[in-house]
Amino acid sequence: MTQTLSQLENRGAFIERHIGPDAAQQQEMLNAVGAESLNALTGQIVPKDIQLATPPQVGEAATEYAALAELKAIAGRNKRFTSYIGMGYTAVQLPPVILRNMLENPGWYTAYTPYQPEVSQGRLEALLNFQQVTLDLTGLDMASASLLDEATAAAEAMAMAKRVSKLKNANRFFVASDVHPQTLDVVRTRAETFGFDVIVDDAAKALDHQDVFGVLLQQVGTTGEIHDYSALITELKSRKVVVSVAADFMALVLLMAPGKQGADIVFGSAQRFGVPMGYGGPHAAFFAAKDEFKRSMPGRIIGVSKDAAGNTALRMAMQTREQHIRREKANSNICTSQVLLANIASLYAVYHGPVGLKRIANRIHRLTDILAAGLQQKGLKLRHAHYFDTLCVEVADKAAVLARAEAAEINLRSDIHNAVGITLDETTTRENVAQLFNVLLGGSHGLNIETLDKDVALDSRSIQQSMLRDDAILTHPVFNRYHSETEMMRYMHSLERKDLALNQAMIPLGSCTMKLNAAAEMIPITWPEFAELHPFCPPEQAEGYHQMISQLSDWLVKLTGYDAVCMQPNSGAQGEYAGLLAIRHYHESRNEGHRDICLIPASAHGTNPASAHMAGMQVVVVACDKNGNIDLDDLRAKAEQHAANLSCIMVTYPSTHGVYEETIREVCEVVHQFGGQVYLDGANMNAQVGITSPGFIGADVSHLNLHKTFCIPHGGGGPGMGPIGVKAHLAPFVPGHSVVQIEGMLTRQGAVSAAPFGSASILPISWMYIRMMGAEGLKQASQVAILNANYIASRLKDAYPVLYTGRDGRVAHECILDIRPLKEETGISELDIAKRLIDYGFHAPTMSFPVAGTLMVEPTESEGKAELDRFIDAMLAIRAEIDQVKAGVWPLEDNPLVNAPHIQSELVAEWAHPYSREVAVFPAGVADKYWPTVKRLDDVYGDRNLFCSCVPISDYQ
């Protein structure tokens, strides 16, 4: 029969590109699990009372090319003015060698958070370099491997200051009045839930206030003034006040390190080290503190350790501080941070080196001096005598200046009384400065830049002598070697090949949804129309962004069954926090602010209790029954016990045990009965889309991990996006923003992120995914994710018991393999299996979560049958190896499992093991072998001998 034009157009072509198994393979797998069709399998697994009759209507699928053309037209509505707004965001020049070989390279952006250090040494080294940059520039002892943005880093600094403060009865936090307004906004939001009083005043008056546990100063104020806070910090320290300083990476190249002035904590944004503004993000924040406070620091910290052979190796250090272990007692709720962006900043520093960075910083400052000199020569007054890159210029006719700026397609900062702000950056040229003269002076001015340059070069006093840096920075060889593009390209490749990412193998991490990040989805993030917009530009310049965000929000509303979506939270953990704040403020609006009990199942992800604590709630744990489901009797008892103060429940669906709980609606009803709200964690949304939805189930609010379900890549540990969907009654209580008031924003509540739409520049990834999949494709993706998980479970269940199943012995989109019986019988642990999988070319599944002694496997819909079979074959081969240990063929203390992973150097070393070299390194054959570069790490050594800065090059050789 002749095909129709519609069939030939094949608008759903991307669906087959995204979903791994083709129709024939799907049928083979369905036969293996005993189901007739995807719909039949879904019908068996998902409780009937929550199944949607039809998929949410988000439109038909579009081809990659059609979707890209459509989004390009939308992006074209954005106006790319030259922005001198500043406020922590500047234009940058991302070196093309980093753009092509890292940002656009799936070997970097598809990797996962480096919990498995043996397959993560490349990005761990890049992150260690980032920490070294932070240490050198801040003058402190300990640095983290990035936080979400500068404003949330400020909030973390406040929380940390309280943790380490010796003034236990003090409950006030002082903020200098010239911090960035978005920073103050987020600090106030966080302080409210912690019960802190925030004092905002001129820094000179910090000593006038009593009962202050911490002070936040900004080295270069929001309107540009450089402050020498040495004396103030000394006096504050004498009073045992914890001092935090917000700083700027580029300014710190020239300015005195705040740590040398006595600051306890220094933080800021690393955005201007090569990361585009992107209408607000994603960007990495840096965070450093004194050594004595290291165990109270938030976020990931990369440390130097040893592997089993005694070689230098890197790992995430001191994880016992973090949410996945300490839960509500964690220092922070951070899970995803900003690894990809931190690594861009790290490599930017490596590529330019100290000499290049000083040249860039000095050029920015020179152009600022030239601009200042010319304006003053023509009679304009500067509000501050000391500055680095930002001028606050007093103008008589501000409206006329702003009109001339708009006509010249220039954005100036306009929210300063009787003045405008101008921040220059590394993209600024002498031609730009000449144009700024025209805008500010109103026509012909007769100023000569060459003449002005000679004048300021001889007599620049805009940086106080006391504030000039007097020590060397970035002296480590890594920052002084890779300055040609050839060397830089090879260095980045050498790092990349140490790691295991999705471009090499499946990453079957349960609860992480490591699905395809398609090239067509990634292309728009580097379009200048999206990448170059300042987050505080006039709304009419961002109409393309607003259209894209509005469409994406509308699709997410339909897919979740909620009434509204807020895009501000820039990670899943931030989404949890924002959702819980919405619940808190809702109760307060009903004069029920006393409701502060958050029920959390024992199986919950560690971010849940950590977020509840941050939102000012008390955690009450609800038991799970022997099948892994929420114990309804225990839930009822605790809901009734705390009825007067019940705020909410946080529940994940499908559960973290990998099953669709039959009683989920009853759970919602019980909580609602006693006055609580239902927070449904969106971590497992990949098993809901098109099949059911949180709103349909009965939940009130959820966050969505766009970096899981909706294809934003994990980036080796960030970026992420965690927008929240809410029912109508919670919509007035989602985060707002103090700087930008955009029509259509839902609320005027405080902010949780620095930018109004969080990490806006990665939202096109999720837009593209939904647009190319369409309603039917999205449902099919969920169904194949379920099929793939059940196929693995059915083929492995005889070798490794599946811990929890639902009806008919089925699982949802992931399954938990119970290793405990094997360990008891043979001594081989889940850790041994995880490390042995590296020899077979796989990243390990999730270890010991949510149950100790288990492996949780989530294959996603993107993996084809061949890759699933390869993984299954590896797991079965490992089981056969365990049997060899059990039979005594290999001793427990010397076998391929306990010695895994094996590295190349072992092949040429003396071999004393009872198994062959071939068994060690080629258990799955020699084709496309992944070689780890270190053996199993010594975690105890790493934490007992904490070292978090760059090691000598010889240690890597």
From Swiss-Prot:
Biological process terms in GO annotation: glycine decarboxylation via glycine cleavage system
Pfam family, one: GcvP2_C
SUPFAM superfamilies recorded: PLP-dependent transferases (SSF53383)
Top EC class of this enzyme: oxidoreductase
UniProt GO molecular function: glycine binding; glycine dehydrogenase (decarboxylating) activity; pyridoxal phosphate binding
One GO cellular component term: cytosol
Keywords of this entry: Oxidoreductase, Pyridoxal phosphate
EC number annotated for this UniProt entry: 1.4.4.2
Disulfide bonds: none
Enzymatic reactions: N(6)-[(R)-lipoyl]-L-lysyl-[glycine-cleavage complex H protein] + glycine + H(+) = N(6)-[(R)-S(8)-aminomethyldihydrolipoyl]-L-lysyl-[glycine-cleavage complex H protein] + CO2
Location of N6-(pyridoxal phosphate)lysine modifications: K708
InterPro entries: GcvP, GDC-P_C, GDC-P_N, GDC_P, PyrdxlP-dep_Trfase, PyrdxlP-dep_Trfase_major, PyrdxlP-dep_Trfase_small
Required cofactor(s): pyridoxal 5'-phosphate
Biological role: The glycine cleavage system catalyzes the degradation of glycine. The P protein binds the alpha-amino group of glycine through its pyridoxal phosphate cofactor; CO(2) is released and the remaining methylamine moiety is then transferred to the lipoamide cofactor of the H protein.
Record-stated family: Belongs to the GcvP family.
Quaternary structure and partners: The glycine cleavage system is composed of four proteins: P, T, L and H.
Name of the protein: Glycine dehydrogenase (decarboxylating)
Protein encoded by which gene: gcvP
